[in-house]
Amino acid sequence: LHADPLSVLQMGCSGTEAIEIAIKMARLATGGKGIICSNATYHGNSHETIRMTIGPFEPDFKRVPFPEKFRPLEEDLPENELCDLYLEEIKRAISEFSENNIPLAGMLFCSIFANEGLPDIPSGFMKKAATLVREAGGVVILDEVQAGFCRTGSWWGYEINNCVPDIVAMGKPMGSGYPLSGVGTSPEIAKIFHEKSYYFNTTASTPLQAAVGSAVLDVIEEEDLLGNVNSVGDYLKDKVKGFAKEYDMVGDVRGLGLFVAIECVEGQGSKKPNNKLAVEFVEKMKQKGFLISNAGQFRNVLKILPPLVF
C-alpha cells in the first residue's frame, strides 16, 4: 500500500509507540539526535513524544512554525514567496543544530498537519522541506496516525503533498478500535534499527493484530470506502461552507476527504482566534450525540471526522 521504499513494517500498539519507534529509527539510521517538528504539534503522550508539544524542547527538538495560508508568517505574499519563508525556518533549525554540535536526525511532521488545524499549506513546501533535511543528513518521518487509511481521500496524507517519507508512523484506524499501530520504512533503515537496538512488545506483532489489520484493509477495499470518502467528503465540505457563510465567526472552512476543519474567529474580517466558541461548539455537539474536537495552535479549529462509512 505504501510507496517505495517503505516495504518493511514494525508493529506496535499505539500511535505514541509508533512515533517513539520512528524517532529511534531516525536517530539510529543517521547517527544524529536533532529532530525538527512543528510549533503546534501533537505526536503522543510518552515522555519523549510529549516534549514536542509542551517541552522541554532543547537541545534535541527544534520547533518551527507550521506552514499555513490563513494566518501566515507574513501577509500578502505570493504563494511561492510564502513557501520560501517557511523553508527558511527549516534552514534555521538545521543551522542551529549544527551550531550546537547536534547532528540532525530528521524532520517529523503530521503529513496533513492535523493537530495544527488542517491548514492549507503553500504548494511544494513538504517536498522542498524534505530535500533540505535529507541534504543535511537527516531523514523524513511523517505521522499518518490521523491521516492514513483513506481519511483524506487518499490512502496516505503524504500522497496529497507529493512527499514520500523515509519513515511513516501509523495508528488509530489501522486497527479500527483494536490497539494496533505500525512503522513503515525501507529495508536499509529497518536493518540498522534491528542491528543497533532491541525492540520487544508482548502484545505487538501477534496473529490477532495481523488478523485485525488485514480485516480492516479488506473492509476498506471491498466496500470501496476510499470512493465513499471522496464523494461524501466533497458533499460534506460543500454543505459546511454553505452554512458557514451565514456566520461571522467562521473564518475559514478547509477539508480533505472526511476531515473538515472550521476556523472559529472573533468576527467577520477578523483572524483573531475564538477558542471559547470552539469549546462551546464541541460541548453542544456532544450533547446532541455527535463527537468532534477542537485543535490548532489556539485550539480554535473544529475538527470534524465522521467514520469512513458516513
Residue ranges and their predicted role:
Residues 1-310:
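Conserved N-terminal phosphate-binding loop of PLP-dependent enzymes in the Aspartate aminotransferase
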